[in-house]
């Protein structure tokens, strides 16, 4: 009996300060505001459309924050769709990535997974003490039959997991979904979509440019909510 009580007491002490869905509410409110306030426009990029999110996607993902913007760069003669979606529970993101979602809407995956790549962006580029952030990503190529010709797109995709950083693969999201310490803070998926006719090098430039503009958001989405250096960490139970 004494041993049972000791085990129970130890479990209680170990878990009573663990994050929960309720304690993470302030964190998700902060993330939603950050996503909604994000400005990716630069001197060369302007928002030309904000397409609505299909109700089916809303129901499946149950997003806490979602932003979709179509941007145009006249200097490059390029256009891109920039999407950020963040869920409250990592498990809601575990099955949602391009090879699963796009074929359900008539897109055909053109090839097997390509090796993940990465770009490096500067944080606080105007500062003399500017640091850098590595953004890994996976490139997916899809085509959709149509008349008079088929459509082709390229998707630059990755995930942000609080406390675990930026990752290019769905397996990392699934592993995070198994961790009750990470699960209440959810996960985010970021996609940059360009026309399939855009050269790979130009597509990479477009992706890097938009990630540079999104640096503060990427840091917010990937830092550990339990390790915020000042004040009380967002979402930590008291």
Put a short name on every predicted segment.
Residues 1-14:
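Hydrophobic membrane-insertion alpha-helices, especially the h-region
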Residues 2-3, 28, 38, 183, ...:
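Active-site-proximal structural scaffolding
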Residues 17-34:
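Alpha-helical transmembrane signal-anchor/signal-peptide segments
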Residues 31-61:
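Short extracytoplasmic
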Residues 65-226:
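A cross-kingdom signal targeting lumenal/periplasmic-facing segments of multi-pass membrane
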Residues 224-238:
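Short, highly charged C-terminal tails/helix-capping segments
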């Amino acid at each position: 009996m004494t041993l049972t009580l000791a085990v129970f007491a130890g479990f209680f002490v170990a878990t009573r300060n663990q994050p929960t869905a309720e304690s993470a509410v302030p964190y998700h409110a902060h993330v939603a505001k950050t996503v909604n306030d994000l400005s990716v426009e630069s001197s060369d990029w302007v928002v030309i459309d904000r397409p609505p999110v299909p109700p089916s996607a809303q129901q499946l993902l149950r997003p806490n924050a979602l932003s979709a913007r179509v941007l145009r760069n006249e200097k490059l003669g390029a256009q891109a769709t920039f999407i950020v979606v963040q869920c409250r529970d990592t498990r809601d993101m575990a099955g949602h990535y391009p090879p699963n979602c796009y074929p359900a809407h008539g897109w055909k995956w053109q090839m097997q997974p390509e090796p993940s790549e990465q770009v490096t962006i500067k944080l606080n580029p105007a500062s003399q003490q500017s640091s850098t952030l590595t953004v890994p990503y996976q490139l997916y190529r899809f085509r959709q039959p149509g008349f008079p010709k088929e459509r082709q797109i390229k998707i630059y995709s990755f995930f942000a997991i609080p406390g675990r950083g930026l990752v290019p693969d769905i397996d990392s999201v699934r592993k995070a979904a198994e961790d009750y310490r990470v699960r209440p803070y959810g996960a985010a998926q970021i996609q940059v979509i360009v026309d399939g006719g855009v050269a790979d090098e130009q597509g990479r430039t477009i992706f890097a440019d938009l990630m540079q503009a999104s640096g503060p958001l990427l840091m917010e989405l990937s830092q550990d909510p339990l390790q915020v250096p000042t004040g009380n960490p967002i979402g930590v139970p008291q």
